Amino acid sequence: MNDLFSNSFKKNQAQLGDVEAGQETMNLDKFFEDVENVKDDMKGVEALYKKLQDSNEECKTVHNAKKVKELRAKMDGDVAMVLKRVKIIKQKLEALEKANANSRNVPGCGPGSSTDRTRSSVVSGLGKKLKDLMDSFQGLRARMNNEYKETVERRYFTITGEKADEQTIDNLIASGESENFLQKAIQEQGRGQILDTISEIQERHDAVKEIEKNLLELHQVFLDMAALVEAQGQQLNNIESHVAKASSFVRRGTDQLQDAREYQKSSRKWTCYAIILFIVIFILLLIPLLPHIMLMLK
């Protein structure tokens, strides 16, 4: 009867273990599917970044206001698409974070478990990739601003034959009102001769300002996601710290248990030695007395 109950208990335990293992596997399968979706979205953002880079390089070689306007429209569309995709990525990351929190309530997947560490580690990896993307777009924004400033400076020199000071260039960039700063050239050369250059500068100004506005909004979304992922990374660090401490306690406990066992073995060994020694001494003491004992018995 005891064997029957014992076997039944073991069977139930095995079935429970199988159920928990199945839940854990399903848990991770769905998780990795969601992670792949986020990675695909990131690849799309990377492709758009490459397009923006190419458009920016092309824009540097263009001297026609109409062409600048076309490139501006193209870049505006690409930046808007980037912003849209990044917002979707942010929503998916938030969903992953929520799923990770729910996963910790599943038996066998609690804080510090291999499943929880895996999930947290993967999301942290996505965060690092996002940071690289954020840095890339920040770098592009800085390059566009610097290149725009250099272009305005060159155009000013081409029209006026004079090298503009820093204040003049900054005012041109800030206002975009090229005519106000090029009145002397207009009076000397005629409005028609420099109209295209003025239009080009204006288009570049509008393009840079619009793209910068969108890139700043994009940067804010990136910062929000970075904060989310940083919290996930901190949680992972805490989990790993607790696991390390637990492992240390386990190792220490194992060492202490081993020491106790060695001490126990040593104690038993010396007890045996003491008993044997006592028996030997008893026999040695008994031998001289044997003749007297034998006489008494007779």
UniProtKB/Swiss-Prot annotation:
One annotated GO biological process: intracellular protein transport
Localisation: Membrane
UniProt main location, coarse: membrane
Residues the record lists as N-acetylmethionine modifications: 1
Gene3D superfamilies with a match to the protein in the record: 1.20.5.110, 1.20.58.70
Segments forming domain t-SNARE coiled-coil homology: 198-260
Residues passing through the membrane, by range: 275-295
Membrane topology: Single-pass type IV membrane protein
Entries under InterPro entries matching the protein: SNARE, Syntaxin, Syntaxin/epimorphin_CS, Syntaxin_N, T_SNARE_dom
Keywords: Acetylation, Coiled coil, Membrane, Protein transport, Transmembrane, Transmembrane helix, Transport
Residue intervals on the Cytoplasmic side: 1-274
Vesicular membrane side: 296-298
GO molecular function: SNAP receptor activity
Coiled-coil regions listed: 25-155
GO cellular component: membrane
Function of the protein: Vesicle trafficking protein that functions in the secretory pathway.
Subunit structure, as described in the record: Part of the t-SNARE complex.
PANTHER family: SYNTAXIN, SYNTAXIN-124-RELATED
Similarity remark: Belongs to the syntaxin family.
Stated name of the protein: Syntaxin-125
Species annotation: Arabidopsis thaliana
